[in-house]
Amino acid sequence: MHTEHKTTADVILPESPACPLNVVLGGTPLLGRLTGIGRYTYELARALVASQIVDDLKLWGDLSFLDAGMLKRGDPTSEGPAGLADKKNRGRSGSLAVSARAFASRSYYASMVYQFVSGAMAERRLRPLADSHLYHSPNFIMPHFDGARVITIHDLSTIRFPQFHRKQMVVLCEGGIHSAIEGKVHVITDSFHVRDELVKDFGVEGSRISTVHLAPDPRCRPRHESECRHALDALGLSHKAFFLSVGTIEPRKNLLRVFEAFRAGRRASHFDWPLIVVGASGWKSSREHEMLDELIKDGLALYLDYVTDDTLLTLYASAGALVFPSLYEGFGLPALEAAACGCPVITSEHSAMAEFAPEQTLFVNPEDVSSISDALKAIPSRSEFGSGFDVSTQAAARTWVDVAQETSDVYRAALQG
């Protein structure tokens, strides 16, 4: 852990805040499947409400306010929250927002029209709340708001690797990031890695940035083989005898090198484990799918696309190792959740993941196929990995209430100006 950095615990706050804490949270990420930023938004909002950290929480969905009651309908013991992608959770406002965003995704110009309309709508609807509420944007884009503002910048991938993103996404995220950097917005980052990028490369004052590490899904835990057997049998898998890859199928996830390293290891008979790939198809992923299809055709891999939370947690707890040597991450939640489930992790050196990874983590050079291959070879042959990771680490024990509490500290600091 980077102990030389300050956390939200270092922010000086009044002992007894006199003002109520009222927050408008950007709810747009809740309109799709709850992966990445959608998951962050849901878990943060749910923890803020459930623990009564905020006095009032409103969800703004670009064109109108969303039904915050959907946060209370999720059952943390079930397969997981569906968000507003599930029609039964949407309500009229959510359905309108989903339809509008579908239109915006059609082209760059449709996206620009959508941003103009939603920006005007936000300015009009949010104006009355400027004196009573703080606005927190969880996804790079900050609407016009005259009150206190907080923005979470999860990563700088659209700036670091613009070639990996659609043009409209690059324009939107770059605009949001630069607006936050140039304005008087307090910034939250998921890692010190991104915080350092903002300070060193973009000249953002460190006093304006707070790092709040994420937490694993509250259902993450090691599971006995008997508990996983039904799901594993359905997939034809053996307990602790397969590699797992989790994340969107896109160039930034470095899957081409993973597939190359995996095939080389199988060809050399270093291991006989299959590779299980979980993740929705992303942009510019045709080559990744071609290589994956070749592995599947040869009986070496299985592609599961998007799976339920319950299935994913079972896979984490059952895998011999998570293979996650991403080229760039703002945090790397799959690595944390896998470790919290007792799964060994192979991930990138000098990355955000190094801030929370357990001692047994195997770090690799993500740009070196042989480095990845050596790590794949090491896992099945090392007995200490047979029973999984020791998950008794600070990061694995962290909860979303911890995240919400530290985030509320940032809110109060932002309100103090």
Can you say where each PLM-predicted feature lies in the sequence?
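Carbohydrate transferase catalytic cores enriched for Leloir-type hexosyltransferases
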Residues: M1-G417
